[in-house]
């Protein structure tokens, strides 16, 4: 990390300002070459802002700027950092960056600033991953959870469990290495009890992973039904935009339409599908097959029925194809009067909630959000104090740790020797260390930071 790096940290495009970040042991020296104000930045106090101009090597003014000086170690990277706020716009910010690079800085790689924060011990790996989750957050709940992770909520819970296991492993190793010494041995009951407590804590975190993934990525929700029941109208109503064509002609939607929406804080990836029915039309038939695949791929299925019509064989076929999925059954067109078959559908719906709505007027759609929140326990997540696992890498590591600790408890119960039991305890320690970065490989670290944008 001897190189001093620089990059534009704000999104490229037209805006009020752009920020160019410089980090490294030559940050102040390089900034002094390009920044001209009342005082040299190398003589400034930490965390101070200075007015001046950026000039290129020929002494030509590039822009009027504000420069913020932050001295190590109290910076994001724990290195000397200078952030230069320029006028927004692609041309100006790129010209300022080019001037800084020519003065001796190196162009930062994707995620290199955050990687330096990790390597310099300011944040652990799970906190580094939270940075990109904050940037990519699509709703308030996921943003709040990512911020909590950045502040160390998940790291703290992982560290608490891992520290107990490290202590346990150390005590066991002493007993194994010096069996004849008169040492204060840890009992087998202590090993079992602590291991089981740690396993339960790991499992508690693991249980949040499925809901956590939804917070991060959204619920893939397929809207299905026979033609002309109001699927496209529902998509348009929820998206608050005319995303799908709506006509009285059956079979208008022939391909899949996807739309990301935020439904009262719930992230949904809505998939409007072609009407499911038997057809001889080649193009429509392809659309129907895609609809069936959408049902298989969906996290949640919304089955649309036409409450103004009779319940026919095509409706029953859709209900049969979705009975094993997380689903909500919507009886549409309630604005035309009460459906005559609502009670019959509820009787055969099993655990699937049934709701009368009007995609045209919006009646009942507020209750749809409540149902989805209940199905995925999103209300409990929002109200909970514990960390939420949103990253599949973390989920995999927690699952490995849980399995190892389960083997510890089961091994003790059948009289397994301590040196064998200790192997699984160390496996659990390593798995938990993968989350925070203590035991992770360089390849994984590089892969994680490669997913970042340049400038972060």
Question: PLM features: residue spans?
Answer:
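Generic preference for hydrophobic
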Residues: 67, 107, 221-223, 246, ...
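C-terminal-of-GTPase-core extension/linker across diverse P-loop GTPases
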Residues: 2-8, 12, 52, 140-262, ...
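Conserved beta-strand segments of alpha/beta enzyme cores
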Residues: 106, 267-269, 353
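Switch I (G2) and immediately adjacent beta-strands of P-loop GTPase domains
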Residues: 50-63, 67-71, 252-279, 297-300
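Short glycine-/small-residue-rich Rossmann-like dinucleotide-binding loops
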Residues: 239, 274-275, 299, 306, ...
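Generic enzyme active-site microenvironment
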Residues: 270, 304, 330
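Inter-motif core of Ras-like GTPase G domains
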Residues: 284-308
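A glycine-rich (often HGG/GG-containing) alpha/beta subdomain
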Residues: 1-144, 148, 152, 328
């Amino acid at each position: 990390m001897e190189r001093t790096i620089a990059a534009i940290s704000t999104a490229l495009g037209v805006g009020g300002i752009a920020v160019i970040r410089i980090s490294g042991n030559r940050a102040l020296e390089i900034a002094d070459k390009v920044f001209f104000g009342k005082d040299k930045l190398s003589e400034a106090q930490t965390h101070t802002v200075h007015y001046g101009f950026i000039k290129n090597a020929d002494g030509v003014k590039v822009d009027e700027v504000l420069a913020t000086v932050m001295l190590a170690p109290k910076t994001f990277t724990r290195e000397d950092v200078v952030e230069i706020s320029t006028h927004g716009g692609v041309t100006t910010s790129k010209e300022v960056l080019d001037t800084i690079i020519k003065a001796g800085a190196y162009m930062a790689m994707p995620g290199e600033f955050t990687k330096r924060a990790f390597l310099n011990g300011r944040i652990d790996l799970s906190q580094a991953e939270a940075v990109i989750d904050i940037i990519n957050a699509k709703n308030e709940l996921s943003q709040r959870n990512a911020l909590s992770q950045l502040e160390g909520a998940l790291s703290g819970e992982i560290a608490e469990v891992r520290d107990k296991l490290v202590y346990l492993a150390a005590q066991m190793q002493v007993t194994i290495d010096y069996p004849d010494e008169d040492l204060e041995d840890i009992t087998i009951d202590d090993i079992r009890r602590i291991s089981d407590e740690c396993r339960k804590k790991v499992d508690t975190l693991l249980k949040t992973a499925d809901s956590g993934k939804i917070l991060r990525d959204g619920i893939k929700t397929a809207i299905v039904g026979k033609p002309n029941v109001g699927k496209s109208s529902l998509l348009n109503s929820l998206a608050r935009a005319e995303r799908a064509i709506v006509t009285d002609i059956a079979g208008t939607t022939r391909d899949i339409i996807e739309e990301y929406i935020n439904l009262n804080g719930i992230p949904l990836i809505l998939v409007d599908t072609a009407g499911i029915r038997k057809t001889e039309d080649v193009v429509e038939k392809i659309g129907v097959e895609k609809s069936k695949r959408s049902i298989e791929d969906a996290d949640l299925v919304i089955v649309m029925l036409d409450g103004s019509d009779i319940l026919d064989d095509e409706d029953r076929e859709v209900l049969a194809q979705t009975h094993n999925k997380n689903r909500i059954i919507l009886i549409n067109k309630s604005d035309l009067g009460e459906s005559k078959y609502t009670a019959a559908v509820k009787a055969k719906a099993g655990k699937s909630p049934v709701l009368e709505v009007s995609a045209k007027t919006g009646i009942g759609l507020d209750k749809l959000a409540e149902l989805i929140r209940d199905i995925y326990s999103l209300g409990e997540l929002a109200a909970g104090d514990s960390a939420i696992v949103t990253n599949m890498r973390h989920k995999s590591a927690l699952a490995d740790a849980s399995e190892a600790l389960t083997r510890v408890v089961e091994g003790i119960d059948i009289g397994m020797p301590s040196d064998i039991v200790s192997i699984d305890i160390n496996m659990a320690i390593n798995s938990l260390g993968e989350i925070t970065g203590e035991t992770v490989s360089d390849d994984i670290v590089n892969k994680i930071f490669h997913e970042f944008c340049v400038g972060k």
